[in-house]
């Protein structure tokens, strides 16, 4: 792991609880992680919170003035062009100027993606960005990354092939899986199952020697621990993401309601408290912080709009892990080495407008 203090630009005005919860998460990050944070947003509101929550680590917090924020009701591409000094734009600009190493935002996800494409650009050889989310599995020592979970409503086989390549790199170097197993989300295990997208993608993944493709993954397989990377289109992935999060929330609520019933239940709950905390750490989305935007030439973590301090802390941790493990550089190196093959597979040019028009820009509630 790198000993260099990573520099993270945080969109302090993005999210339902900005800026207080965003700043609180950043304070914890500079206290516990080897990071330096640029808080981009309204300097008066940010500084007010910092003054009320003094910490020796605050020397590693810097306030960057921004003007405005992209609201959830705004069309992302129009808004980021109309608001050049919005917090998400200036956050991306810090990375572009190499004053920061990564961006974390709990604001408008479509705006974050559009700003990343405009300011940072795509990695050469990658046609579409993808949002990758990490899920727990039945194996406590193993996680699975699913992508795309919301960057693109529609997709093409070659996009999913690229997602598989990027996911494999992340799984290997960040999640620590020496031999990642890649699965294609589908309605059956057999290669003949699925729609046209699934069938053609299966052919590409099977024939690419750089992808350790295990086969189709059914919905029940995603969290089984059998796969380390699962690829799908953003429409399907976003539904999977929100369903999985709701199941985790329901399970935690049921445990809270059922365990304390009666004296025996209260005693049992007291004994099980450490176990319950570990369960929460594994299934609560706040513990994961956010999702990496793959395919852009910079580290960008997209967090929930409902993120509070713990989520922001974990999002900054995710950003630092991506920086320390050189995820972007490794993807760039791979695409450069295999550029001829990638260009041969590319039949059309993807424009920013095409990406923005297909992006899923709703806020995760």
From Swiss-Prot:
Q: What is its EC number?
A: 2.3.1.274
In terms of one coarse class, where is the protein primarily found?
cytoplasm
Localisation per UniProt entry: Cytoplasm
Is the keyword Lipid biosynthesis in the record?
yes
Example of a GO biological process term: fatty acid biosynthetic process
This protein's pathway? Lipid metabolism; phospholipid metabolism
Report the family membership. Answer: Belongs to the PlsX family.
The record's annotation in NCBIfam families points to: plsX (TIGR00182)
Oligomeric form and interacting partners: Homodimer. Probably interacts with PlsY.
Record-given protein name? Phosphate acyltransferase
Name of the gene encoding the protein in the UniProt record:
plsX
